[in-house]
């Protein structure tokens, strides 16, 4: 679910007339999620089921130590020119790379503008001073998208902090989904304490399993 060029990266096909099973595979030159580097070069894959706006799925990617495995479900729909979604996502890890995240996801859109909010809890420690306590965070993102081009400003509040800007272009060639993006993240989102500027390339392919 956490593909680089979209930052989380679920695309809901709400309101379809039949149930759809699909799979996806991908690769990223650098795997960033919400402005934070997860791994330099990362393969990924996922499975999804969607029916009349309801969806459930799983997605996994290689990270520094082990695998990240996500599970998610929710509902997305449209009302006139507005789109909306609500769901749950859990982020789990097989190694020592990170601890579990769980969050409620809210989304809304109108035309080329979309707003996403995640309200979550983290089993690790954003701040060493708060070690041993579950951490709360809110993630917010504002995205403008048109004809494959997009720009996003996003950040964190509560126990987490930091913000980033991302811009890119996604397109399809020979049934492959390609993306090129640039990302500028502040020092709060860097493990080195320095700001990040990155050029990211992604490639992926989706499969209809019906």
Which role fits each region the language model picked out?
Residues 3-7, 11-210:
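Outer-membrane beta-barrel proteins
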């Amino acid at each position: 679910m956490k593909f680089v060029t979209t930052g989380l990266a679920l695309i809901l096909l709400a309101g379809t007339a039949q149930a759809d099973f699909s799979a996806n595979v991908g690769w990223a030159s650098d795997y960033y999620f919400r402005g934070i580097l997860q791994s330099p070069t990362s393969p990924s894959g996922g499975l999804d089921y969607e029916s009349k706006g309801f969806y459930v799925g799983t997605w996994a990617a290689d990270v520094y130590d082990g695998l990240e495995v996500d599970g998610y479900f929710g509902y997305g729909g449209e009302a006139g020119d507005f789109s909306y979604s609500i769901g749950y996502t859990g982020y789990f890890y097989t190694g020592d790379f990170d601890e579990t995240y769980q969050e409620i996801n809210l989304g809304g859109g109108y035309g080329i503008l979309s707003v996403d909010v995640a309200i979550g809890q983290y089993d690790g420690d954003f701040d060493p001073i708060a070690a041993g306590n579950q951490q709360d965070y809110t993630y917010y993102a504002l995205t403008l998208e048109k004809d494959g081009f997009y720009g996003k400003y996003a950040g964190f509040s509560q126990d987490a902090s930091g913000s980033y800007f991302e811009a890119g272009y996604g397109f399809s060639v020979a049934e492959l989904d390609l993306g090129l993006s640039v990302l500028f993240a502040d020092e709060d989102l860097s493990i080195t304490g320095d700001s990040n500027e990155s050029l990211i390339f992604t490639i992926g392919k989706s499969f209809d399993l019906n």
